[in-house]
């Protein structure tokens, strides 16, 4: 018996068992102390029942842990914390069960999975066994109620008029203003100066697209990085400073020292001479004009006595052949540009013309009478004289001229115009207007302006065209231009800048502060245009100047194109104080969300006009970042209007200040404390004093 008990005692003896079964010694860690073996928590007893309840109550996705990067935090960041109701990880099957609040959240999550299929893979569905839950049988014999139709985001429900922000009434159309054409066919009647100086009727379709610079909204000295472009003055013109600075005597001396003389025919500088008599000629064309006279005088030391009609003083103007190199002199529209040949002979002749106009124009006298359409005059710009052709003199205070040596259109007054001699008027004009193929005509906004200003005359472009693409209605050749240095297509660049891109709904919107603002001019006897009067009973209207009213209408063409053909978002409800593109009376306009009431009709303030209208979400689109157009409409308070006007007073105000009318303000003032504009109108004061 004793031997058996001793054997039992020894069998229980195991000195290593304590260390083997001790959990403290069985923790495996790496160098940084991180556990390599995770301890699985004990599952609760009712885990299966709870899981079945969750799967029956909430829609879910099954995400397998296909890689170590698929973690709980990664799924939260991927789907969004707002969509996820709960999350469960099964260690044995190594899958995540992601539960969502509702079906809409599930569909949103599925769309994200479909958009990025390489990140995660999901298994949708619900096992039949786990979905079955024991419940008491329904003992009621009454039929189940028929579910109502699902609410559609595109359904137009009744408008909730219980709003904090007042809305406009009346449903009047927004006013449209179109600038009268600068030149008409009547100006080209037989015998007129315009018909003589513009035989191809190029200026019949000329446009003035740079009106915003007159209101100091675009300042070249601040906008551009190229110092020389300051002399472009809103359209690409360049005055060669080196040509102006160097005097004729110093330039002649330096050229003679380099073995350069003036051509006996065209009087341009050249280093080409006859080998026998050392007579200078520019090229074979100049030599051919005086070949007979040179043959008789060559080697005899005689000087050629040439008539003024002999030879061409300047190379022949016109559009160079396809494949030639050109330089840009000015931009008229987004798709119309003035170019000249970059040939060295044209360069010399072009700057010679500019220099001659500057030098001889110093002694010109001012115009004493109103010029006529088509007359060549001199215009003083930045202290230098330039040749210009008068296009429109309907308003003596706003005379439209085109700089024939550049191509740009300018508005000036009689005091800045000078008489042009017949000699200067007869000098050759080299810039030619061409139309960029595939580039639409759009509003000249900040983005395209900055590019225009930076395209200096130092840049050389390769021009290509086909004579079959000549636009006879506009009098221009359709061309493709490519910058030689970096092989960049000017047509493609302009088209990319001018085409707006619809932002994603998930992107942050744009505030009203992102847009520049052009305020009203303060002073006396100022004419303004009424853009909206729906809040006239509150004592204010929305106005702008006549010039800016043209720009507002011109801007709508781009916005309409975006709303009809580019924006594809079916529904959009912009947050409060964010910009959007909204439809009003069938036309797309710029808007600002001012109130959301949950009925599908956000209150939209149309910032270019001033009315506030509940607009359905199907008629709203996200605001594209390319539309950095300035706000040109201002709220104008009417001094003297009572806080609660009578019906008779409201009727009188609506009649005398209708939408689209031009009114004369006796005085416009600005209050810095309230940041508001107000006006005093004598006619209004007289009416209110009678009451």
UniProtKB/Swiss-Prot annotation:
Segments forming domain Tudor: 366-427, 573-630
SUPFAM superfamilies listed in its UniProt record: Tudor/PWWP/MBT
Keywords: Cytoplasm, Meiosis, Repeat
Record lineage: Eukaryota, Metazoa, Ecdysozoa, Arthropoda, Hexapoda
One BP annotation, GO: oogenesis
Further remark: 'Vreteno' means 'woolspinning spindle' in Bulgarian, referring to its eggshell phenotype.
Keyword Transferase: no
Annotated localization: Cytoplasm; Cytoplasm, Cytoplasmic ribonucleoprotein granule
Pfam families from the UniProt entry: TUDOR
GO CC terms, sorted: cytoplasm; cytosol; P granule; Yb body
Entry-linked InterPro entries: Tudor, Tudor_vreteno-like_rpt2
Phenotype upon gene inactivation: Both female and male vret mutants are sterile.
Annotated phenotype, changing residue 610 to E: In vret(48-15); ventralized eggs with no defects in somatic gonadal cell patterning, germ cell differentiation or oocyte specification
CDD domains recorded: Tudor_vreteno-like_rpt1, Tudor_vreteno-like_rpt2
UniProt note on tissues of expression: Gonad-specific.
Source organism per UniProt: Drosophila melanogaster
Protein's recorded name: Protein vreteno
Role of this protein: Gonad-specific protein essential for germline development to repress transposable elements and preventing their mobilization, which is essential for the germline integrity. Acts via the piRNA metabolic process in both germline and somatic gonadal tissues by mediating the repression of transposable elements during meiosis. Required for primary piRNA biogenesis in both germline and somatic gonadal tissues.
Stretches for region Disordered: 128-155
